[in-house]
Amino acid sequence: MSISNETTVNLQEEYEKRQIQEVLDELDRDLVGLIPVKTRIKEIAALLLVHRLRKLLGLTSANPGLHMSFTGSPGTGKTTVALKMADILFRLGYVRKGHLITVTRDDLVGQYIGHTAPKTKEVLKRAMGGVLFIDEAYYLYKPDNERDYGAEAIEILLQVMENQRDDLVIIFAGYKDRMDSFYESNPGLSSRVANHIDFPDYTPEELLIIGKIMLEEQQYRLTKESELVLLDYIKLRMKEPHFANARSVRNAIDRARMRQANRMFNAGDKVLTKSDLVTIQPEDLLKSRLFKK
């Protein structure tokens, strides 16, 4: 059946029907900064929506490549964005369930001959109809170890990425330099990953905002002086090894809460007000080892 060139579809109506803006608004609300990442997600959502409308009018085109690569440091929102991406894919009908399964090498690779295939296939079975997020994916490939079984897991993933791409989306994640090397060593994998999104590190000011949000969610607050101390802490921590962006800020806040509790406990019989219980004072942060160096 031919369709007239005058046949119309309503882009805005379909966009609203699928409630894509709702997911994008959640992304804006849940993640501070990351403007380049949010822009890429919106671009992908637009492509998927237009492709869906083309299909409604019988226009021929291959399904857009949906497998993705998220690169960046720990704590930059990769898992959160993967969750939102799974939701978008579900709302637009590209996956059946829209759930996210997060795994690492240990979930896929066995320790002896014959162990890897069943492990990998079991994970894939759970992920079908949704999105499989493989964190630190480069650990799957260990070229220096001939007895490593990671290559077997990669081969199974390759087959599924090609043969069942209409029922599963795979997102590979990790540090950018290591992921680049991983793709160079596995060209078959690289050719099947169409969307590469780089997650920048947060600025100190963005991390301060994130820290304040984390505290507000737990009904704590910072004084003006405490805000300045936390900002100083973040700037110092960023220069230290194993800095993990929002995760490092969360750890700092957890320790500050513990110091606050001990400070009040050690004060003896003092009657505490609600303000005492919710306020993180500068001293609760200044006792960090970073300020003693």
UniProtKB/Swiss-Prot annotation:
One family name in Pfam for this protein: AAA
Matches recorded under CDD domains: AAA
Residues reported in the UniProt entry to bind ATP: 72-79
Record keywords, A-Z: ATP-binding, Chloroplast, Nucleotide-binding, Plastid
InterPro entries the UniProt entry points to: AAA+_ATPase (IPR003593), AAA_lid_6 (IPR041627), ATPase_AAA_core (IPR003959), CbxX/CfqX_mono (IPR000470), CbxX/CfxQ (IPR000641), CbxX/CfxQ_RuBisCO_ESX (IPR050773), P-loop_NTPase (IPR027417)
Family: Belongs to the CbxX/CfxQ family.
Protein name as it appears in the record: Protein CfxQ homolog
UniProt organism field: Guillardia theta
Gene: cfxQ
